[in-house]
Each structure stands twice: as structure tokens, then as C-alpha cells.
């Protein structure tokens, strides 16, 4: 002790890098305890995780103000940061920004649609694009208008916060929720509640990777919930039953009624649809279950490899049982295990139920599904559609995951008027129109990953097929520009993945047949490889005519292709 006192210091106690206590100053010190991101050493995480650790994703507003004031385009780090606010610098495809909104359940008012048209006209390229998450995007926004766009959007009662990078994306619900005669449950309140929960919890803006959630209420139009990380699927129990508590296997009484099944880990770019998790959830508990599952992913997802950071990889590593057990620890009520077979599932969705005129649950009212070719709307069309909704409906609009929109609440007396007006502005409403089944990602015109110009080629392809044949069974054709599958090509009747082909690197597609969602869920199988786009319209014309000639009575295209092997299809369609 004399030696310590003579040196003029206090007796030392510190912590080593491994968390142990030490009396040796050389081994300890606050700066030696390694920083971590949810348990992963900071030295092991990706650069994106380091950026988020240095500054919270929602603390970048001043950066955007600075860039907007200077009219400056962002570097790599700020490109990443600005996406947290819904502004995407899409270089090199376009040296400008794309706005991606958040429109929970795809619900818009006529006034909001007009306001979005104003934003597209004043700051963008005069167009908007309906996305596969029932959302809207506006492109070709200059850097000087970064903040102008977002403040105008907020003035409309909308936001873009968290619509990109490592966040929970736009929350989808059944497109016909609230007016569908077949639905088991109106899912809009769940989508809106989760939307606001996300907006008010900062920790949810620091996920390991993007996250998709959908609520399927059992209506006529498929929500494509099985392509989401979490899909809540409405089911019905016809009579009193008993489930088992996940906590202790104790029996739990279940009164008859509507519940949610929870499906997990849909990620179509990896050829995986969401699978039933074996549990039954009361609607009143759905939001808590969703929040708990997201928190488990937040705390345990991989932050060292962005290619393996989605929920699928955590569940692959742990197994479903452990994932549910970890989620259970965060809940004040027990998970209920219940066999899927004892639930009454919804009937199959109406193929192309998002296109055409359909009766609503409300007497004398109809919804009109509008064909929006590859999701592109001009500002004139946006305003006219808003006018139609306001003048002949209730002023409400719905966007769907099929890249189109619905005008609900149209009285019987005005249906023909609305149909005529749609044709006058270059839009359609016929369920037999092949353009109604086209889905296309942004493509090389606005995305650096895309190998092909998907949207323009989709329109060319649709026009050719419309001219050459008449469909009597609706068919979906999905075009995606790269393996990320933003257009979900593996679940289309016909799926097309863009590739470069030949020595000249011309644009072409791998061709997939037999995909589906919902009650008809399946991952399609690749039949043709690297078909130049110049040959594709003729090939698909031959494919569809062969199907029509050789199918069984009432057989869908998906069923026809599924009952044949790849080699058989290649031979049949090459004749």
C-alpha cells in the first residue's frame, strides 16, 4: 500500500475486453470493452451496420437539408442513410432520386392522389408507379428537391419514413378489405396499427435487413401474404375447440370464430414461400405477436453478411420452434398450437379479382378494378382517377400488390359511366385483358441491378399476346430484371427473370412456369434459359396456344404446367 500511496494513485479495478474484472491497468479500461451491435462485435459487422451504429438512421434529416441546399448528390454512405427517409438515389440508372411512399393497406383518398400527382408533376417525371406492396413511387427527383418532396408528402398526411433499407416496409392488407362479401376479417385496422407502431418506435429503424408484413383477411383478391417475412392469414374455427399452450402444453379453450394463422419466412427471390408456423392468434393479440417477432429478429438477426440477414436465415439457423419460443418470452399471453387442418381456410382467391366490376358487401355498391399497365400512371390519369373516385364513389382508392388500383363504393347507376371514363383516359377494366395480369419491376431504366428494361418490354409483350390470342382463363406474367425478384417472378403463372444473353449481351429472360400464391401457392420451375427478348413474344404466344389446345377441361395454365416435367414442356412448347 505504501507503494500505491507514493505513486499518488488509487487502487485500480477495471474490466477486460472479455468482461472480467482486473486489478491490472494494462488489462483493463473502459475503452477495452469491445463495442457490439446487439451482441455482434463492431469489428465484425457490415459497413452499413457501422453507419447505423455511428448515427441512428432517423437522425439524418440535417444531412438531407445540407444536400438539398447545395443541390448535391450523396456519396455511398449518405445514399444509404437517405433511404431511411424514403429517398433513393438510383445512380447509375438515373442520376436523380426516387420517392417511395408508405401507404398502409394501400388506402388513399382522392385528395391524396391529387396531391401525389402534384408532387410528380412539380418535382418528378410526371408519372407514378404502383408497386407490388400496394404503394406508390415517383422518380427523377433532383437533389435540390429532396426536402421539398418529403414536406409536401407529409402535408398530405402521408410519409415515406422507413420505406427503404433495413426497415419494415409498407404494411399490406387485403385490397378489398371492408367491402368484400367473402372476407372473414377487415384487415385494414391491423395494417394501420402496425404502421403507426413502427413510426413511433425508433428501434424498429435498425433491423438487420428489410422486413415485410401482410394481413390477409380472406377476401376475393389475394394479398400475396405468403411472400412476406410474416403473413397473418385469417381463418375460421367452426366450433369450440382446444389448442395447446406453447409454454407448458396446457390445454387452452378456443371459442368458435375468426383467428389468424401466422406464416413465416416468405422470400421469393430465394424460391421460398412463407410456411405455416403452427400457431393460432386472436386478432386482438396479432399486433403484439408481430412486434415481438420483429424484436426477436432485431436482436438476433445476422449483421455480418447482408446476403444472409433476412428472417429466413435466422429461422433456418434456429428452427421454427426456437424462434417461437424466443418470441413467447416477450409475450404476456401464451402462443396456442393448433392444427391447420382443423381451421376453415378461405376459398381460393378470384384470379384477377383485382380487375373488373364486382359487387360489394354494401347493398347497391361495386368496386371497379382498374388495369394500370405495369403500374405506370401519368399525372393526368392520377387526377382523373381521383375525380372518378370523388364524383362517383366515396372518394376512396385502393392500391393492390398486383400493380393496379380499385375504385370502391360505386353505385350501380354509375358503373357504366366510370367504365367509359376509364377508357377515355387510357385505362381499362376487363379481366380478360392480358395487360391486367402483367407485373413488372422498375427495370434497367431506374435500377442498377436490372439486366433488362422490364416495364417497356412487358407492355410490348402484352400487346403482342393480346393481339394474337384470346384468354378464357386469367394468366399472370411477372417480369423481374434481376435475381432479387422484386416482381416476384417465381409466383407468376409465367415468370421472367432478366439476364444478358449472347456475346453481344443483349437483353433476355429465363422463363419460369407454374407459380402461384394463396390457396394455389407454388414456386415456379424454370423451363427455358436465356431467351432473347426479341424471341420471347413469339415463344410465349406458342406456349399459350399449345396450352389452350392440349389442356384438360377447365385446367389452368399453372395446373397444366405443373403436371408436366420440364423436359416435356420444353419439347411441347418447341414444336
Predicted region positions:
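Peripheral terminal and linker regions in Fe-S/redox and tRNA-modifying enzymes
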Residues: 2-575
Amino acid at each position: 500500500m505504501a507503494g500505491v500511496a507514493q505513486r499518488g494513485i488509487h487502487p485500480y479495478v477495471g474490466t477486460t475486453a472479455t468482461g472480467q474484472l482486473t486489478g491490472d491497468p494494462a488489462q483493463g479500461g473502459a475503452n477495452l470493452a469491445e463495442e457490439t451491435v446487439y451482441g455482434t462485435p463492431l469489428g465484425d459487422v457490415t459497413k452499413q451496420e457501422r453507419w447505423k451504429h455511428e448515427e441512428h438512421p432517423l437522425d439524418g434529416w440535417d444531412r438531407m437539408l445540407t444536400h438539398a441546399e447545395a443541390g448535391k448528390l450523396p456519396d455511398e454512405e449518405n445514399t444509404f442513410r437517405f433511404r431511411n427517409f424514403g429517398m433513393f438515389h438510383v445512380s447509375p440508372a438515373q442520376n436523380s432520386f426516387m420517392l417511395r411512399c408508405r401507404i398502409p393497406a394501400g388506402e388513399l383518398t382522392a385528395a391524396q392522389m391529387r396531391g401525389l400527382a402534384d408532387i410528380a408533376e412539380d418535382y418528378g417525371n410526371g408519372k407514378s408507379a404502383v408497386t407490388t406492396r400496394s404503394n406508390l413511387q415517383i422518380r427523377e427527383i433532383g437533389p435540390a428537391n429532396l426536402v421539398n418532396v418529403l414536406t409536401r408528402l407529409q402535408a398530405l398526411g402521408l410519409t415515406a419514413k422507413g420505406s427503404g433499407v433495413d426497415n419494415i416496409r409498407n404494411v399490406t392488407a387485403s385490397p378489398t378489405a371492408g367491402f368484400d362479401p367473402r372476407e372473414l376479417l377487415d384487415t385494414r385496422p391491423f395494417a394501420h396499427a402496425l404502421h403507426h407502431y413502427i413510426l413511433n418506435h425508433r428501434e424498429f429503424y435498425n433491423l438487420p435487413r428489410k422486413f415485410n408484413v401482410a394481413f390477409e383477411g380472406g377476401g376475393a383478391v389475394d394479398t400475396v401474404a405468403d411472400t412476406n417475412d410474416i403473413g397473418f392469414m385469417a381463418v375460421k374455427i367452426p366450433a369450440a375447440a382446444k389448442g395447446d399452450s406453447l409454454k407448458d402444453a396446457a390445454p387452452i379453450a378456443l371459442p368458435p370464430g375468426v383467428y389468424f394463422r401466422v406464416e413465416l419466412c416468405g422470400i421469393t427471390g430465394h424460391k421460398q414461400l412463407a410456411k405455416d408456423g403452427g400457431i393460432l392468434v386472436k386478432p386482438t393479440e396479432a399486433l403484439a405477436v408481430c412486434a415481438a417477432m420483429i424484436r426477436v429478429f432485431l436482436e438476433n438477426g445476422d449483421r455480418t453478411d447482408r446476403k444472409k440477414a433476412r428472417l429466413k436465415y435466422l429461422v433456418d439457423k434456429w428452427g421454427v420452434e426456437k424462434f417461437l419460443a424466443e418470441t413467447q418470452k416477450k409475450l404476456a399471453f401464451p402462443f396456442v398450437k393448433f392444427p391447420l387442418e382443423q381451421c376453415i381456410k378461405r376459398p381460393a382467391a378470384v384470379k384477377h379479382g383485382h380487375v373488373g366490376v364486382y359487387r360489394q358487401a354494401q347493398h347497391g355498391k361495386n368496386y371497379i378494378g382498374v388495369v394500370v399497365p405495369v403500374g405506370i400512371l401519368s399525372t393526368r390519369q392520377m387526377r382523373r382517377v381521383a375525380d372518378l373516385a370523388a364524383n362517383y364513389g366515396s372518394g376512396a382508392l385502393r392500391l393492390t400488390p398486383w400493380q393496379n388500383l380499385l375504385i370502391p363504393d360505386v353505385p350501380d347507376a354509375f358503373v357504366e359511366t366510370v367504365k367509359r371514363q376509364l377508357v377515355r383516359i387510357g385505362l381499362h377494366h376487363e379481366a380478360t385483358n392480358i395487360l391486367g395480369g402483367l407485373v413488372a419491376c422498375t427495370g434497367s431504366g431506374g435500377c442498377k441491378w436490372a439486366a433488362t428494361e422490364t416495364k417497356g418490354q412487358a407492355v410490348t409483350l402484352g400487346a403482342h399476346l393480346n393481339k394474337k390470342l384470346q384468354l378464357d382463363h386469367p394468366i399472370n406474367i411477372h417480369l423481374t430484371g434481376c435475381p432479387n425478384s422484386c416482381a416476384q417472378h417465381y409466383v407468376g403463372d409465367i415468370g421472367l427473370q432478366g439476364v444478358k444473353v449472347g456475346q453481344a449481351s443483349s437483353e433476355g429472360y429465363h422463363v419460369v412456369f407454374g407459380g402461384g400464391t394463396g390457396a394455389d401457392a407454388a414456386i415456379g420451375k424454370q423451363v427455358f434459359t436465356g431467351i432473347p427478348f426479341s424471341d420471347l413474344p413469339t415463344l410465349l404466344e406458342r406456349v399459350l396456344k399449345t396450352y389452350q389446345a392440349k389442356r384438360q377441361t377447365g385446367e389452368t395454365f399453372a395446373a397444366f404446367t405443373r403436371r408436366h416435367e420440364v423436359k416435356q414442356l420444353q419439347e411441347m412448347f418447341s414444336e
